[in-house]
Amino acid sequence: MKHYVAVDIGASSGRLILGKLVNEKLQLEEIHRFKNGFTYRDGHERWEIDQLMQEIFIGLEKVKQLGISECVLGIDTWGVDYVLIGASGEKLADPISYRDKRTLNAVQNLTSEYPREYIYKKTGIQFMELNTLYQLYVEERDLLERAEKILLIPDYIGYVLTGVKVAETTNSSTTQMLNLREQLFDKDLLSHLNIDVEKFAPLTDAGTYLGKVKEEWLEEYDIPNCDVVTVATHDTASAVVGTPAEGENWAFLSSGTWSLIGMELSAPINNEAAFKENYTNEWGAYGTYRFLKNIMGLWIVQEIARMDDYKHSFAEMAEEASNYPYFKQIINVNDARFNNPENMVDEIKLYCQETGQTIPETIGELTNCVYGSLALYYALELEKMTEITGKKIEKLYIVGGGSNVAMLNQLTAKLAGIEVFAGPSEATAIGNLVVQMINQGEIESMRAGRKIIRNSFEIGEFSCGDVRFEEIKERFTKVLEFN
């Protein structure tokens, strides 16, 4: 029996999940979990990438302690951030977080030189200041000139483990630098940044064998001899693979620090309507596209908890929220002011004051406001997706940590007026494992993998119901007019 390890690292935590296929069912075991985050150093918010590597080795040592001497391994992380590699293969600096303020106004500045419509027609990717395109636009020229390669975070981890440099496609597409038609890094865009296309590793599809873990790591650490497979390295791409969807006319919501809501399509949509609504066409596994919108997600709730010194668990916060009427206050969860404020609680209160609403005071009121606003935003985006794609959406599959928030799931079902299916919460790691298993011949296809997922995990169901959607939508429109 083969053993598979998913290295799944998000913006706030990481984990190593051991998986195996037994009687056509996936069995998972969490081996190691660790915190992730950025710290302010050398003038920027930076990821502790060396510490992340140490946590991976700690997790792999725990796998070996279970008596497993050989395994298959895949890596997925958050997107857009990168490591610059020098001529000798060394890391030139710790990677800067997408939440760093260096890209403020970068979209505006770059698109004043290079038209938005032109960039969107080429890439099909939504405009966000955190995109790699804008990070590289403001990167230190000296570092860029010294860099031989630019590797996104999961590709860097794979490189450290195996010595092989690649640019996996699902994650590379989030850079806003891949040309949809040519299926390559766009030379014109890179030329505008004065970056040679050769600084990027060869584009590699999800499901490709990468290589074996280097001998030096087997000697330094007591870890299994691992075959590394390049999975869908963008965590959302893996989460979509791990979605237990069946049939047609469904949408997905990967709900975690970010909310990513969209549809899996066989071809991108980069027409005027998609451009106007700032939709993105991220590449998916096995020739698919993730037509989606990035929405600020549970990050806002996480920050409320942090401002409260974590006195309440997330379950307690949700319970407190249920004591208040929904939609008393509504915020635009995708307003840039909620990206990384000094104090999230104060920012929400100030927003409500500025938009003529009552001010939420308690932890329950604040949480209620955010969950209600998220559900409303999801419903509005599902409406827009239907208009742009011409496809009727009948089901929404919510995966990731947010699938455990029953209140948010039920509110979404009511506002959107469709059935909502919630779970599994570890869809990203599951999708990571499924791609490994397809590579190794244990699972036939992504469709077959999704059937196995449906048979392996409990999926919650939330029915649609009566709610004053049009009235709430009108109130939200008025709130937006204050901005």
From Swiss-Prot:
Disulphide linkage map: C352-C369
Record InterPro entries: ATPase_NBD, FGGY_C, FGGY_N, Rhamnulokinase
Swiss-Prot/TrEMBL keywords: ATP-binding, Disulfide bond, Kinase, Magnesium, Nucleotide-binding, Rhamnose metabolism, Transferase
UniProt: substrate binding residues: G79, H234, D235, T236, N294
EC number assigned by the record: 2.7.1.5
Gene Ontology terms: cellular component: cytosol
Residues engaged in binding ATP: A11, S12, S13, G14, R15, T257, Q302, G401
Coiled-coil blocks: none
Active-site residue list: D235
HAMAP family cross-referenced by the UniProt entry: Rhamnulokinase
PANTHER family, per the entry: L-RHAMNULOKINASE (PTHR10196:SF93), SUGAR KINASE (PTHR10196)
Family under the similarity heading: Belongs to the rhamnulokinase family.
Protein name: Rhamnulokinase
